[in-house]
Amino acid sequence: MVLDCVSTGKAGHAARNEGINAITLAMKDIEWFNTYQFPEKSDFLGPVKMSVTIIHAGTQHNVVPDRCEFTVDIRTNEFYPNEKLFELIKSQVGCEIKARSFRLNSTRTDLQHPFVRRAVMMGKEPFGSPTLSDQALMHFPSVKIGPGNSARSHAADEYIGLMEIRAAID
């Protein structure tokens, strides 16, 4: 889930210590996003992860900003559907928040599903992926498989090694 957040202050001249600094207001909420830990942790996905990824504020060096916009990327687990998580967050922060969408929740396939059990019999180990995929739109049991290391996703030098491809084929 992605949240667009806005902290609103009051513009003023920096030299006269006027106004209410929207950046200072946003910092309190950003600190909450950086430190809060939801109590329910998934065996496969771990805790809910919240990362502030974009911040925009201010227009001039001598003006106290009246608006600070920031974006939060949230990776949920099966204990917190997006709408429930949104309401919990809304009750904790002072900024205005809007979710871009509620439809892409985390997913999990039962470990007792025949496909998962067969994969385990073949020596594969079930795991959780914190990344988002089309799997979130599938309303039937599914698994996410393929070569490579998810930790290299979205990096400047993203790649899959030839040996990883060969191992996946075998």
Regions found by a protein language model. Give the residues of each.
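Metal-dependent amide/peptide-bond hydrolase catalytic core
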Residues: 2-170
